[in-house]
Amino acid sequence: VTNGAAPVLETRDLTVRRGRAVVLDRVSLALPPGSITALVGPNGAGKSTLIAAVLGQIEFEGRILFHWRRDGRIGFVPQRFATDPTLPLTAGEFLALTRQRRPLCLGIAAAVRARVDGLLADADLGGFASRPLGMLSGGEMQRLLLANATDPLPELLLLDEPATGLDERAVRRFEEHLRAARAGSGITTLLISHDPAQVRRLADHVVELDRAVVRHAASVGLS
């Protein structure tokens, strides 16, 4: 699709069932290009299920349409990233995993290491390359995941309650890094959030799910 006005992501009558239960019921929404769209609603409304459908992780009915302008890359930051505290994988190795072809047991290539060091520095994690993932705080882990999800720049960024469990300072730092990652890039973003203040700070478009049905969509002013 070459129409510049076309949404980057569009769902049409998206329905997800779990047994006899309908989790998403004919949900139709569109994400304007370059926007941050907040997806809000009560627990159990199907917000995370919608992201799982977009990522192709679950079966669904209806249509999910992508109107790509570049390479169609999707970045994703989950609500939580479960790590085994005994796993020796470090922050630097985590970023290197998808940035080189050779196994990590053979070492990290010099060019990849330089790239990883740059990503860590941009995420305020300079000097953390050798720190095991299990030793990162919640805020540090979320900034690491954001750095991973936005390099290379995606066309669509999915954030599933990325600030859950973080204190106010960590939330604000995450938001600062999100703004920096999006600055001038035109990354279309879908943000799930239960924090009205965060939605007001970040979103310029809001979609409300109520009982798994889109009940309200509106534009909001950025603060």
Question: Residue ranges of each PLM-predicted region?
Answer:
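H-loop (His-switch) and adjacent beta-strand-loop-beta switch element
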Residues: 205-219
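Conserved ABC ATPase "signature" region
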Residues: 110-128
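Catalytic Walker B motif of ABC-type/P-loop ATPase nucleotide-binding domains
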Residues: 157-160
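The feature captures the beta-strand-to-loop junction immediately N-terminal to the Walker
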Residues: 40-42
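H-loop/switch region of ABC-family ATPase nucleotide-binding domains
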Residues: 193-194
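Conserved ABC ATPase signature
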Residues: 132-136
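Helix N-cap at the start of a conserved alpha-helix in ABC-type nucleotide-binding domains
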Residues: 168-170
